[in-house]
A protein has these predicted regions:
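Active-site neighborhoods of divalent-metal-dependent phosphate/nucleic-acid chemistry enzymes
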Residues: 66-109
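Acidic, PIN/NYN-like endoribonuclease modules and their adjacent C-terminal/linker elements
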Residues: 1-3, 41, 98-128
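Short, hinge-like loop/turn segments at secondary-structure boundaries
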Residues: 49-53, 85-86, 125-128
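Short, well-structured N-terminal submotif of metal-dependent ribonuclease cores
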Residues: 1-34, 46-58
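Short loop->beta-strand "edge-of-pocket" segments that line small-molecule binding or catalytic clefts
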Residues: 4, 30-33, 63-67, 107
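Amphipathic alpha-helical segments within well-ordered protein domains
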Residues: 43, 61, 79-82
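Alpha-helix capping/helix-boundary segments
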Residues: 10-11, 38, 74, 96-97, ...
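Helix-loop "lid/cap" segments that line or gate small-molecule binding pockets
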Residues: 42-47, 64
Length: 128
């Protein structure tokens, strides 16, 4: 299996054992990576929800060890996506995830249904 990129929404769904999380097989998770922007986004949501920061980082590092640094290339790609994604209300975190997928030429997984309306040159898979 080739590399796949996970959005923060997928990470949160996995950690909270939400519907659709069962689609994240061991094989898929073994090839998964996440942008450091989305890693921070997921950690922030968990900590804001009352989780212990130390436990949050231990879980994220255990389940999602492959975090890709947000580079100038990713920044450029994320900025280029603004016009295409504005109507869908995608955040910087969303565009950062898509930028990583585009840079890696890898499929991306999200729980955000609006992403299926995008045509950014990489496959978009919905968790649910």
């Amino acid at each position: 299996m080739s590399k796949v990129v996970l959005d923060a929404s997928v990470v949160l769904a996995f950690l909270h054992e939400e519907p659709g999380a069962e689609r994240l097989t061991d094989e898929l998770l073994a090839e998964a990576c996440i942008s450091t922007v989305n890693l921070a986004e997921a950690a922030t949501k968990l900590i804001q929800g009352g989780d212990d920061p130390g436990a949050v980082w231990r879980d994220l590092e255990f389940f999602f060890p492959s975090a890709e640094a947000f580079t100038r290339t990713h920044a450029r790609l994320a900025a280029k996506l603004v016009q295409q994604t504005r109507a869908l209300g995608l955040s910087l975190g969303d565009r950062s995830c898509l930028a990583l997928a585009i840079a890696l030429k890898a499929p991306v997984w999200t729980a955000d249904r609006s992403w299926k309306k995008l045509n950014v040159g990489v496959p978009v898979h919905l968790l649910r």
